Amino acid sequence: MLTPAVFPAVLYLLALVVWVEMFCLVAVAVVEREIAWALLLRMLVVGLMVEVGAAAAWTFVRCLAYQRSFPVLTAFP
C-alpha cells in the first residue's frame, strides 16, 4: 500500500528511469542527430520536474515526521 512515506521513493525511482532513458537518448543522438536531441531536451525537462517533485515530497514527509517542526504551506490555514 502506498503511504506518504513511500511517495519520495517512488518519485526517485521514476527520476532514475528518466535519467537512464536520457543516457540512452544521448547514445542515439551521437549516431542519429535528427529527433534524438528534441527527445533528449524533453526528457531533461521531465527529469528535472520529477526531481523537484521528489524533493518537495521528501521535505513534506520529513516535516510530518518531525511533527511539523517547520511550517508547511497549506491551502486552508
UniProtKB/Swiss-Prot annotation:
Keywords: Host membrane, Membrane, Transmembrane, Transmembrane helix. GO terms for cellular component: host cell membrane; membrane. It is found in: Host membrane. It comes from the Viruses. The keyword Ligase does not apply. Coiled coil: none annotated. It is a multi-pass membrane protein. The keyword ATP-binding does not apply. This is Protein UL148C. The chain crosses the membrane at residues 10-30, 35-55.
